[in-house]
A protein has these predicted regions:
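Bacterial Sec-dependent N-terminal signal peptides
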Residues: 1-17
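Bacterial N-terminal signal peptides
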Residues: 17-25
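Sec/Tat signal peptide C-region and signal peptidase I cleavage site
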Residues: 27-32
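Surface-exposed loop/turn motifs in large extracellular/passenger domains
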Residues: 33-62, 66-326, 331-349, 355-368, ...
Length: 383
């Protein structure tokens, strides 16, 4: 039988072709199985884990180092950066639990967007009927030595906002937009010794969660409470001006654990700027704090804040969802709350006795308002 001879050149070409094919296949597998944090647009082909396990992929920001599962950040003079993430029906886990092993220089964020950044996450862009879920968990380290900011770390589920706004730049240029078309679950957040929040917004931010936002009971905690007013835990936190948060529905039930300082909290600007135009909209769901706890509120709002729970966009009519609420509402002058109790809805609680702001309650047939709230008394501005 005659055998075909293969030249050395042909052999080299064949070997090179096989090597290229193998490398191409290997690269594809690595892309599918990547556990690196996300900082660019991406389409999933399988369930995705974004994990911080070392000090790579954590760029220095202006004030502290950041570890984030999804990070949107550009320098002040850069153009707006857009990150589009299509989960394509797969689940996304943002695991920042190993940040605690990196030392006291790092705070942890599931999703962090600031400085001219737009982030859009779609659960399934082409087939909305097949949806995935985003799960967030994070831990940071506390150090008993020193008093510098680097010694006191924080953990946040979702943090949005433009820190440059403190220098009074234009809102239109600085607005940080984050849209999440998926359900989000906060599984665990353990901060070092300063604010730990499920959601945090700071100046010129627009966050929309078009899905269900859940904080599991007892998920938020601190390792060490040692900085007075700065040692706080919040479900949703706002500070500064021009912040908008919209959530289709929420499930935050802290009625048994009592681990939250306040479920919803807003503060005035820390830098002497205006505190105004802050809006929170929640379509319905469960929002509960542990009753009979001194100075722990369902809502604790500084001036310039409006919140809408199960009401329409302008607060003129009741919504169509159910709301299960528990806790006291405290509002400073210049702030307003709009609460809608449809059939099957319930609010156990009331307002702080010396409330300065306004609470507008919509109570339809079948809704229930129970004011047995530790004797604090209630004053509803409009009923």
């Amino acid at each position: 039988m005659k055998r075909n001879k293969v030249s050395k050149l042909q052999m080299r070409r064949l070997a090179a072709g096989v090597t290229i094919a193998l490398l191409a296949g290997t690269c594809q597998v690595m892309a599918d199985q990547s556990t690196n944090p996300i900082s660019e647009s991406e389409v999933f082909t399988a369930d995705r884990l974004a994990q911080v396990v070392n000090k790579n992929n954590m760029p220095k920001e202006r004030f502290k180092s950041v570890a984030a599962g999804i990070l949107g950040y550009t320098h002040d003079k850069a153009s707006i950066k857009t990150i589009n993430i299509d989960m394509a029906g797969h689940d996304l886990t943002l695991d920042l639990t190993k940040v605690a092993d990196l030392g006291t220089d790092y705070s942890a964020y599931g999703i962090k967007a600031n400085n001219k950044t737009t982030i859009v996450v779609d659960s399934n862009k082409t087939n909305p009927g097949k949806n995935g879920t985003i799960t967030i968990k994070a831990k940071t380290l506390w150090s008993p030595s020193g008093d510098s900011g680097s010694k006191y770390t924080a953990a946040h589920g979702i943090a949005v906002g433009n820190f440059s706004q403190r220098f009074n730049k234009k809102v239109s240029e600085d607005l940080v937009k984050t849209t999440i078309n998926a359900d989000v679950v906060i599984e665990e957040l353990r901060g070092g010794s300063i604010k730990t929040t499920g959601i945090s917004s700071m100046d010129c931010s627009d966050l929309a969660i078009n899905g269900r936002f859940t904080i599991k009971p007892g998920a938020i905690s601190l390792m060490q409470w040692n900085r007075g007013d700065q040692s706080k835990t919040y479900g949703i936190y706002m500070i500064g001006s021009n912040n908008t948060i919209s959530i289709t529905s929420a499930d935050i039930d802290d009625s048994k654990h009592g681990s939250l300082s306040d479920l919803i909290k807003t503060d005035e600007s820390l830098w002497g700027g205006k505190t105004e135009k802050n809006v929170l909209r929640i379509g319905g769901g469960t929002l509960k704090v542990k009753e009979n706890q001194k100075e722990r509120y369902l809502i604790s709002a500084a001036k310039g804040f409006r919140t809408f729970i199960n009401v329409n966009q302008d607060g003129s009519a009741i919504g169509i969802s159910k709301a299960d609420l528990q806790g006291t509402i405290r509002m400073d002058a210049g702030s307003e709350a709009y609460v809608g109790l449809t059939a099957g809805s319930k609010w156990v609680g009331g307002t702080q006795a010396d409330i300065k702001g306004k609470v507008n309650l919509f109570l339809s047939e079948g809704g229930e308002w129970n004011t047995l709230n530790a004797g604090q008394g209630s004053r509803v501005t409009r009923f």
